[in-house]
Every structure is written in structure tokens, then in C-alpha cells.
Amino acid sequence: MSFQEVWEKEPMKKPRIQKVTVNFGVGEAGDRLTIGAKVIEELTGQSPVRTLAKQTNPAFGIRKKLPIGLKVTLRGKKAEEFLKNAFTAFKACGKTLFASSFDQVGNFSFGVPEHIDFPGQKYDPSVGIYGMDICVTFEKSGYRVKSRKVKRSHIPEKHLVTKDEAIEYIQAKFDTEVVRE
């Protein structure tokens, strides 16, 4: 029996996207970070959070706690819409998604080297080109029991999202090919 048949028969077992995290590693503070914030806000529709350097690196001119990156967490419909555009951009730059990008609980990540590959984006010399990392986290119905305050419990292993389930979900929902090595 395929996963699709199981999901139709038992909807609680169907995985869903918990969140999509978009990371911009700008590498420096200042104008480039400000422009990057405008780019990421235009792509996602949400204002980003600045990420701080964890350690000092004099070779790159980075001090501890200096803002060097941006991130946005998307959930629900916004996450799915952004992921559709991200897969379009990912395919446009000639990349393929490999099964090795998925971990054992179905989460995966990929990178888009240029933000201008997204639909509706044009190159602007004053902005430049920004790349990003996109991380997708999966869950199933009932995952709230592990994070709630009252009567917290663990999720049994049989109810965790597997690598194969996540791959089939992505292939069916977003019409994206995942190459198995």
C-alpha cells in the first residue's frame, strides 16, 4: 500500500509543513544587511529577524554579537506559497533536489543561489544578488503534545514523519523530482 492510500484512509498520518525557515547569510553589517532585509521582506511578505555573529573573526572583520544575517519563519499558507516559488527558482537555476538533503525525520533544506530566480524578481544593480538557504520542517497531526505546557508527552516513533513520506509528499504536492542516489 502506498503512502497516498494510507493518507486517504488515515488522515492523521498525513504529513504537513510545520514551518519554512529562510536564512540569508549576508556576512556583514551595514547597507548590505539593510538591502537584504528589503529583499527578503519582498520575497516572503514578512519582516526578517537579524541573526548575530556567535564569535569574533578578525580575518572577515566580524565581531561577536554583530548582526551578519537575516532569517524569516513562515507557517501555514504563506509557507506553501513561498515554497512553490522557491522550487520554481530552484529549478530555474538548473539544480536538482537529492534524497540526501532529507534527514531521518523528513526535514530537508536546499539553497537558491540568486534571489532573481524567483518569479517576478528582476536584477537591480543597486541591490545586487543575494542567495538563501531554505529549511523545511514537517510534522503530523498530534505533534502539539510534545510542546504544550500541560500534560506534555513524547511522540512515538511510529508517528514521526519518515524520510520516504516527506519525499513522496514533496513530489505529490509541489511536482518536484527528488533524485535518489
From Swiss-Prot:
This is one of the proteins that bind and probably mediate the attachment of the 5S RNA into the large ribosomal subunit, where it forms part of the central protuberance. In the 70S ribosome it contacts protein S13 of the 30S subunit (bridge B1b), connecting the 2 subunits; this bridge is implicated in subunit movement. May contact the P site tRNA; the 5S rRNA and some of its associated proteins might help stabilize positioning of ribosome-bound tRNAs. PROSITE patterns: RIBOSOMAL_L5. The gene is rpl5. Belongs to the universal ribosomal protein uL5 family. Keywords: Ribonucleoprotein, Ribosomal protein, RNA-binding, rRNA-binding, tRNA-binding. SUPFAM superfamilies: RL5-like. Coiled coil: none annotated. Part of the 50S ribosomal subunit; contacts the 5S rRNA and probably tRNA. Forms a bridge to the 30S subunit in the 70S ribosome. This is Large ribosomal subunit protein uL5. Disulfide bonds: none annotated. GO terms for biological process: translation.
